[in-house]
Amino acid sequence: MYRDHTKVIQIGDRKIGGGNPILIQSMTNTKTEDVEQTVAQILALEQAGCDIIRCAVPTMEAAKALKEIKKQIHIPLVADIHFDYRLAIAAMENGADKIRINPGNIGSTERIKAVVDVAKERGIPIRVGVNSGSLEKELVEKYHGVTAEGLVESALDKVHIIEDLGYDNLVISIKYSDVLMCAKAHELIAEKTNYPLHVGITEAGTLYSGNIKSAIGLGIILNQGIGDTIRVSLTGAPLEEIKSAKRILKTLGLRKGGIEVVSCPTCGRTQIDLIGLANKVETMVQDIPLDIKVAVMGCVVNGPGEAKEADIGIAGGVGVGLLIKHGEIIKKVPEDQLLDTLREELLNWK
């Protein structure tokens, strides 16, 4: 698999590449200059399972704020830089564990060298990021539009700029909102380089459409063994990105931990408020540290059979439900006690 052979990169106290676990990233949507709000959001993201956090650094005040933010958080901090090379330098001087730049908009080779020199001195990795919106005009013309081949050529051109300055502590990201083209770009670049890849579908959309596009895109890419860190980019609360990323990794067998809830679709045999019950179960289990499968079924006719592959499950009936464990019916429970009974079983799980 590609990710087993990618270069190992140290980001703060975490390692990516070389077969290390795929890490989940998100990005704050607070003003980085507002240390209190930014720290509060990062701590909440940490609690949800975020492994690496990125903050926008559009001003010198934001760059300087990183120093205080870094003191109060427990995961690696990435500074997102555009246009001004001095912000990249200031971010590193104030504790950034990694910087994200597009060498194409940083400026002259001298300015890029100034950034690379500080990164080299401090051992800070640089994420070289390109996306469809920043693709050079000559590459658009060469490939007759925005293409996977053009994105890959652009990314490698920028990598070569930094390599020529004697630095290879790099991560690459290629972002595009077109799922299939983004997948193709990752397939192409994974064949051409062994740098770790940060994977995501950019501008994926709202919670509904963004989750669908991200699940499909990341699923295609990750299932080929490509990708060392991921972000589910959503127009929504950053916490939702973490929930989705964890579920995608777990579904692909790339991360353990957390209860998986499965539930049947509603039909004419449903004898209980299955939609409400399934949602309550999913919310209830979020903070229970088990790695098991829980089934929520809508009737006592097919429920027990359909729940056999789950570790534990409940099936609703008329005023009464069943508690099922490892495919066996354990007991009947009054309908209004189903949720509490399931919770008690989970809290005492052995």
Question: Each PLM stretch: what is its role?
Answer:
Residues M60-I81, A114-I126, L188-L197, V281-T283:
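Alpha-helix-loop-beta-strand connector modules within alpha/beta enzyme cores
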Residues N131, L139-V285:
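Catalytic alpha/beta core domains of metabolic enzymes, predominantly
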Residues G19-Q37, A56, I75-F83, L139-V152, ...:
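Active-site mouth loops of central-metabolism enzymes
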Residues M1-M27, K120, T283:
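N-terminal amphipathic alpha-helix/helix-capping segment at the start of soluble metabolic enzymes
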Residues I22-T28, I53-C55, L77-I81, I99-I101, ...:
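Hydrophobic faces of well-ordered beta-strands that scaffold small-molecule active sites
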Residues R86-R127:
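Hydrophobic or amphipathic alpha-helical targeting/insertion segments
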Residues Q72-I75, M92-I99, K120-G123, A190-P196, ...:
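Glycine-enriched alpha-helix->loop->beta-strand junction motifs that scaffold or abut catalytic
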Residues N29, D34-V35, E46-I69, R100-S108, ...:
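Glycine-rich, proline-tolerant flexible connector loops at the mouths of alpha/beta enzymes
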